[in-house]
């Protein structure tokens, strides 16, 4: 239905998502719009997720986290809920937020491991949580899944020098290096180069 601003609900939702990117003031404005929309559609998951994002970006992290925790209880193992909440926790940037995001994403690794966005979020969460080994592995996997196998290989080779890498982790990294290397060699043979790598 159209409101006095001349926009229907779908347009107001889209506008709220756009203004949310405009810093705290935009997020505050988006929060008000989304809260109004959610009142009319209390079971709409996408509105609830967007409202949680807006709350966090408007400086209301505790309220946002409470909303996301409730959504997780209502939708356990939901990738959209987990990925959105992980993004927000990563933006909050604390060690505790990283630990919460890492713990929430870990059970989804087996079914989402081939998703570069998932790997990026898991990598950042692990980094914030102080788990440098898992962070490096996930960043390398994200690079590979984004079409950057040489970058992934270099990251994994660097990870092997990390003193925090234990025997099991080293075996896992060695196996991944072994599986990626043929792809990298074939790309080199074809003359395909990763433009982001410094070849001086």
Task: Cite the ranges covered by each PLM segment.
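Extracytoplasmic and endomembrane cell-envelope/extracellular-matrix remodeling and assembly machinery
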Residues: 1-46, 50-67, 164-165, 175-178, ...
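Structural register within alpha-helical repeat arrays
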Residues: 15, 51, 85-89, 122-125, ...
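Specific register positions within alpha-helical solenoid repeats of the TPR/Sel1-like families, i.e.
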Residues: 18-20, 56, 90-92, 127, ...
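Single-residue signature of alpha-solenoid repeat helices
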Residues: 30, 64, 101, 135-136, ...
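Canonical positions in the second alpha-helix
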Residues: 36-37, 70-71, 107-108, 142, ...
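Short coil turns that delineate tetratricopeptide repeat
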Residues: 42, 76, 112-113, 130, ...
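Alpha-helical linker/edge segments of TPR/alpha-solenoid repeat scaffolds
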Residues: 61-62, 93-98, 128-137, 165-169, ...
């Amino acid at each position: 239905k159209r409101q006095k601003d001349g926009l229907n609900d779908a347009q107001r939702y889209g506008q709220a998502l756009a203004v949310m990117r405009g810093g705290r003031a935009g997020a505050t404005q988006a929060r008000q719009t989304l809260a109004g929309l959610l009142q009319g559609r209390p079971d709409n998951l996408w509105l609830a997720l967007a409202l949680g994002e807006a709350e966090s970006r408007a400086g209301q992290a505790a309220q946002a986290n409470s909303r996301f925790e409730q959504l997780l209880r209502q939708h356990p193992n939901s990738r959209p809920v987990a990925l959105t909440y992980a993004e927000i926790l990563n933006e909050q940037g604390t060690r505790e937020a990283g630990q919460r995001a890492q713990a929430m994403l870990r059970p989804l690794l087996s079914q989402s491991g081939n998703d570069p966005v998932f790997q990026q979020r898991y990598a950042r969460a692990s980094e914030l949580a102080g788990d440098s080994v898992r962070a490096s592995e996930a960043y390398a996997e994200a690079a590979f899944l984004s079409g950057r196998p040489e970058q992934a290989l270099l990251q994994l080779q660097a990870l092997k020098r990390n003193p925090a890498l234990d025997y099991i982790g080293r075996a896992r990294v060695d196996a991944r290096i072994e599986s990626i290397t043929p792809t990298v060699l074939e790309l080199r043979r074809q003359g395909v180069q990763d433009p982001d790598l410094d070849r001086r």
